[in-house]
């Protein structure tokens, strides 16, 4: 029976290392795999530094990012851990969400304290909705002065509090990734302490299947004698036949109706689940009442909006993006889920223009409403070509 088998496997959590360049993010990632390999050899292969450092490139919404994916297990959990070698890769990953993080390990060198990129990563983590942070105070073996260590820890806590993380309460663990990698038992113990903090301070995320049903509509057609069918890939939740649904987005008004049947490859199903490509038969809905870009939802669980704040990354010319900057009142298309909607851009005060390769915040006003929530990802396009990527940080109206 599949269900019992699933409960036997460990809960899965996605995390990543963030922080300033050369503070030891990649060394720490390698050290975690080594220490966990030594502790639970049958569960964990060891991943050396140079394998993580030469991370393969992958594309997310047309943007190339170098990301290293590492897997490991503690006694309690199975982790997928992302580490990006370059600072630009981090920013791109966090904004495009190529690798989603349920929590992050913020690496700060005790020898330096928080640096500009430390601040930038924490700010971005807050903007893109990384919900929990655990701090690894790395290179602690190189600082003999206890007072200095306490001072650095205080600085990190204040930085996190300034971005609305619980800076006073979250775990800060003093580690030495290099010493742990060299096999020093005391520092290996500190790394196990860090992983225990990750196990206990980064809560289990809610699985997509447990959230309310949402399916973006990709296509609409009419089946003679049966009515209108909408197809798409269910993004989250579960839907059963004869449940009420709501159609949201693109039009001024949302429509409520009943889903009278669910099919896949012309077979009827008893439910549609997150991740499945399905057709939903809708009662009493005309073909012209629905279109691509709307979403089918559990009634009341998503609302249409036209105005929002966002954090975005604009592709460089080398990445196939624009060759020139854009200015106030720029009017590209914003691609949400399955459709493009034109929007007008207002840049933040003090920003006159945005260059290719920049990341920035902006306010956008769409010409049609989209079912929207905080953190929703989108691409910015011009004539079907991706020129940027972003996510909603705040809904205005």
Curated annotation (Swiss-Prot):
Residues 138-141 are annotated as: G4. Gene3D superfamilies: P-loop containing nucleotide triphosphate hydrolases, Translation factors. It catalyses: GTP + H2O = GDP + phosphate + H(+). The keyword Protein biosynthesis applies. Residues 10-206 form the tr-type G domain. The keyword Magnesium applies. Its EC number is 3.6.5.3. Residues 19-26 are annotated as: G1. It is an enzyme of class 3 (hydrolase). Keywords: Cytoplasm, Elongation factor, GTP-binding, Hydrolase, Magnesium, Metal-binding, Nucleotide-binding, Protein biosynthesis. This is Elongation factor Tu. The gene is tuf.
